[in-house]
Amino acid sequence: IISSLAWLGIEHDGDEYIQSKNITKHVAIAEELIKKGFAYECYCSEEEINEQKEKCKKQGMPYVYNRKWRDAKDLEIPKDIKPVIRFKSKISGNTIIKDLVQGERNISNSTIEDFVILRKDKSPTYQLSATVDDHEMNITHVIRGDDHMINSFKQKQIYDAMGWEVPNFAHIPLIHSE
């Protein structure tokens, strides 16, 4: 990456940052989100998830996790399943992003599933690690392809839950061949 940026005339101005070296912080933030009520342990088995996906496919619907464990009080925790940690996405209203390229963008919160932020092995997903690391490095601008717009809506909800300042987002249209 560094050499590719140099080829473009963009000089590297700091230490290289390796995301996997910050896992302890990512896990700590996931645990804090649980304590604040913005995340939860999900004990769905792979079989359950696959059944849900197949059901959605048969109905011609995109898969969205059914939130079974979101507010679980009476469910028995399976002893043979390690949980993933899911972020509690907002259910109502809209999430709004002021994009520097595309202007104000919004999405209905009902279309954002409760996404996984920590896998069963406690490794963070992109949504959590990118958000935490950008915050830790005081990133002010996130510039990426517009295929990542949905990620920005999810990450904005994490920023809001943690009370962190949201960086400026700029989503650039991708170059597509004919």
Model-derived features: positions:
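Active-site cores that bind ATP or allylic diphosphates and position pyrophosphate for catalysis
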Residues: 18-19, 35-178
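Glycine-rich loop at the start of a catalytic domain that most often binds anionic cofactors/ligands
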Residues: 2-5, 28-32, 54-56
